[in-house]
Design a protein with these regions (language model features):
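Active-site adenylate/phosphate-handling loop in enzymes that bind or generate adenylated species
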Residues: 348-406, 483, 488, 492-512
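A short glycine/serine-rich beta->alpha loop
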Residues: 93-96, 336, 595-600
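Glycine-rich phosphate-binding/catalytic subdomain of phosphoryl-transfer
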Residues: 105, 349, 405-415
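Generic hydrophobic alpha-helical membrane-span motif
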Residues: 38, 147-150, 272-275, 369, ...
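Short beta-alpha connecting loops at secondary-structure transitions
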Residues: 166, 289-290, 336, 380-388
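Short low-complexity, flexible loop/linker segments enriched in glycine and/or proline
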Residues: 329-333, 354, 376-378, 561-563
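Cysteine-centered catalytic environments shared across enzyme families
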Residues: 1-334, 346, 350, 539-540, ...
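Adenosyl-5′-phosphate
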Residues: 1-4, 23, 42, 168, ...
Length: 623
């Protein structure tokens, strides 16, 4: 795990801006506190901050080059099949100077050209410079576990692992991308390829960008998860195959030259990972859990249950979140607005885990691969209700949408969306500030600009292009391309790298995900049971209470905070003169929103998102 940055000039005779590369790397010391390295060749300059994981010797430093130094690469991430690739490349005559996983990339490129990406199993964002061809290749792993941001203009290209670092390049004016702001308010994250800065883009997951002969290329997809290659077999047979897939995904992620452990929340997913690790380790697995003084949001007893079963070297801590201290750090590290409240416990968990290990395995990705969220079952119910005869669906939608009880807001929203297209209804279930609520909050100019829901249009395009015919898998495909990459994996990357911790996600292994995509939806979601086939894998491995407990999630009591502890701060942030003068929101509408929340309507998530947006403006736009 590391931080990478670089620049490429369009003019082949230009001198690259090495100082900009150094500034960007200096802004990412937390991603790589162990070492740094730079390379300049013609119009290209590359920079790297190193967090040493594999081959801790100086020979493992980056940039890595081939035998004659003509090809160089900087990598943020891990290549899990590097030993197999190394043997194959050595058999073809390639010479290696290190034991690093990253070095295989330059030699693989010599053999395969830009198609080298097809052979990598791992998590990565990388930049490869081919000096003789004057070719720069940027690439991101299949599911976007590692981030990569870039800005292109008439002078050339500049890129970095973090938005905040890219902003230090001085190559673009810090203007907000208003379309991205609207998308953030809908989703609580900025979806790819947008970023919160105008003219800056995320390289989408599974894409590469090739620059050659003075031309800055466009992102091109080298990987697309396929849902149109269904597998056959009974639940028992597919469970056995999935068990082997999870076991292998865990095995390849336990290779490390530094201390390694695991997150253990006590939920199904992290517990399964710990069980698999324990069965493959000769030493007790180091496990880490974080709890909160609010018992409603603490899972420590469940984590202890799994720890006791497998005899792990367990570490747990109970914290009282210090919001005043943490929020500014959040805003700075994320580089753009991000309002998933589970980012806070993830932050504390990573901070605590880093005191004991340098690498941790997590259970992220299972919900998106195997249908773990309620919105999948809600969508299935809506499909069934819409198939009722005659006018019944419309009448039911009207009845549910007009329930007068204030506490029944979710039921009313469900009723109002019952007759909408599938992707619009699904977005409504996932959205934190639905389109009609955003429009009501906006000032006149914003209200006019977003009369159409651009986020719904984007979701519609992805939904229509899905290769899945199964309705459950079609929604999983949508979540994998949006929520998994731009919320879950972003949250884990930022929280972990802020504390120089590498996190590996076995359940987002590319081979496991391909198998999951081939499994019928009915083996994932059956009745009220979510993640059915994964639960079958876990049955013989975990206590019954872990298997049957209700999904709790990793969020925090935002509604209560925004009504009590953070109420004064939210008013100060959202209603002061600075916020009013931006012209984004109608101050009267913000006043009404805050009042509604104080009166008992659950608007905490919306207020939290508005706060994160305003604080981002102050940190990155107003400076």
């Amino acid at each position: 795990m590391c931080g990478i940055a670089g620049t490429l000039a369009v003019d082949p005779n230009a001198t690259p801006d090495g100082e900009a590369v150094q500034r960007m790397c200096d802004a990412m010391v937390h991603r790589g506190p162990d070492d740094h390295g730079y390379l300049t060749d013609g119009p290209c300059a590359l920079g790297h901050r190193r967090l040493s994981i594999i081959d801790l010797r100086p020979e493992g430093a980056q940039p890595m080059t081939n035998e004659d130094g003509s090809i160089a690469v900087i990598v943020n991430g891990e290549i899990y099949n590097f030993q197999e690739l190394r043997r194959d490349l050595q058999a073809k005559g390639h010479t290696f100077r290190s034991l690093s996983d990253s070095e295989v990339i330059v030699h693989l490129y010599e053999e395969e050209g830009v198609d080298f990406l097809d052979h990598l199993r791992g998590m990565f964002a990388l930049a490869l410079w081919d000096g003789p061809r004057r070719r720069l290749v940027l690439a991101r792993d299949r599911f976007g576990k590692k981030p990569l941001f870039y800005h292109a203009d008439s002078r050339g290209l500049v890129f970095a692992s973090e938005l905040g670092a890219l902003a230090e390049s001085g190559r673009f004016e810090r203007r907000p991308d208003i379309d991205a702001i609207d998308a953030f308010l809908s989703l609580q994250y900025v979806p790819s390829p947008w970023t919160a800065f105008e003219g800056v883009r995320k390289l989408p997951a599974g894409c590469r960008l090739v620059c050659e002969a003075g031309r800055i290329g466009e992102p091109e997809r080298y990987f697309q998860l396929r849902f149109d290659q269904p597998t056959t077999g009974s639940l028992t047979e597919l469970t056995e195959r999935l068990h082997a897939q999870v076991e292998d995904a865990v095995r390849v992620r336990m290779v490390s030259d530094v201390p390694l452990g695991a997150f253990l929340s006590g939920g199904l997913d992290s517990s399964l990972i710990v069980a698999m690790m324990a069965m493959q380790s000769s030493q007790p697995v180091k496990t880490f859990s974080v709890g909160f003084t609010s018992k409603d949001f603490s899972e420590l007893p469940y984590a202890k249950m799994v720890s006791d079963r497998y005899g792990t070297d367990h570490h747990e801590i109970v914290v009282e979140p210090d919001m005043a201290a943490v929020i500014p750090e959040f805003v700075r590290h994320y580089g753009e607005p991000f309002a998933d409240s589970s980012a806070l416990p993830t932050w504390y968990l990573c901070q605590y885990t880093r005191t004991g290990v340098t690498v941790a395995l997590s259970g992220d990705g299972a919900d998106e691969a195997f249908a773990g969220y309620r919105r999948y079952s809600h969508s299935r119910t809506a499909r069934a209700l819409r198939q009722l005869p005659g006018p019944l669906p419309t009448a039911l939608a009207k009845a549910l949408g007009s329930i007068p009880i204030p506490a029944a807001q979710q039921v009313r929203d469900y009723g109002r969306r019952l007759m909408e297209p599938e992707h619009v209804r699904f977005l409504g279930l996932a959205a934190h500030i639905p389109h009609e609520d955003r429009v009501a909050l906006y000032g006149p100019a914003m209200r006019q600009r977003f009369a159409e829901d651009l986020v719904a249009r984007r979701f519609g395009e992805l939904y229509a292009a899905s290769t899945a015919s199964d309705p459950v898998n079609r929604l999983l495909d949508l979540d994998i391309q949006t929520y998994l990459t731009d919320d879950i994996l972003t949250k884990v990357d930022i929280a972990s790298m802020a504390h120089s911790l590498e996190v590996r996600c076995p359940l987002v292994d590319q081979e496991l995900m391909a198998f999951a995509a081939s499994v019928p939806g009915e083996m994932k979601l059956r009745g009220l049971t979510t993640k059915l086939i994964l639960r079958e894998v876990a049955k013989p491995l975990l206590p019954e209470k872990i298997l049957t407990r209700r999904k709790q999630g990793f969020g925090l009591p935002v509604d209560r905070w925004m009504r009590d502890d953070l109420a004064p701060l939210s008013r100060d942030v959202l209603l002061d003169q600075t916020a009013r003068e931006r012209g984004i929101f109608d101050p009267a509408a913000i006043e009404t929103l805050l009042l509604q929340h104080q009166r008992g309507e659950p608007r905490g998530d919306q207020i939290w998102a508005l706060m994160m947006l305003e604080l981002w403006y102050r940190a990155f736009i107003d400076r």
